[in-house]
Amino acid sequence: GWSSEKLAGKIGNKAERLASLNSSIGTMETLEGSTQVYSLSHTGYGENGGVTLNTSTNVIDIKFGSTANFVHEMTHAGQFETGDVAFTNTGMSLLQDVYDETAAYKAQFGYSPSSVSGLTSTSVANSFGAITPAWVQGLKDATGSTPYAVGGSANTGLIPVNINSTRDALIQAYPWNAVKFRGLPANYNIRTLQGIYYKR
């Protein structure tokens, strides 16, 4: 049989997964009740999921390849609702940080642990606790690149940022873009920029 410790661990993991799934359902309800319009689309073969803004219609597209990937990308759409993510005038996301990605991978793990534990990183994420900012930064894509690492293609911030973050927080989050931010006023935040689409 199972030891009481092993049994408690299994029950604990199930309870965490249930709480995560309930949180994902709550996010879906928020999106469904939002004044923001969302669309769903499947990725093509070999494409990554993502959340983008159609700048002609202001509809946010949640693009996904599997149900587990949908839970991940839908979490990012929920981050738009809370002001943790915004969009540029070209429809690309802004303010994504490693904590946003950590939350999305945890939500995905809650739905399908194997869809996350099978990913290549610095360690195997076989529990919620193993999905950390460092684990996210170590994730490798199909080409072996680390998109969430410092300077990676995903332009992922190092600290939590949102539409109210000041210039100094943005410099801390994106030090590779510090030169661009330094000329801005100290009380600057992303909401003061023309053409930025965020939840009002």
Regions found by a protein language model. Name each.
Residues N48-T55:
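Short, exposed beta-strand/loop patches in secreted or surface proteins that constitute
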Residues W2-S23, V51, G91-R200:
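Active-site or metal-binding loop neighborhoods of secreted/extracellular toxin and effector enzymes
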Residues A68-T82:
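Active-site recognition of the HExxH zinc-binding catalytic motif
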Residues S20-T27, S34:
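Metal-centered catalytic cores of metalloenzymes
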Residues T55-F70, L94:
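Short pre-active-site segment immediately N-terminal to the catalytic Zn-binding motif
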Residues G65-T67, D84, Y111-S112:
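Solvent-exposed loop/turn segments at secondary-structure junctions
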Residues S4-A8, G33-N48:
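Long, low-complexity, intrinsically disordered regions
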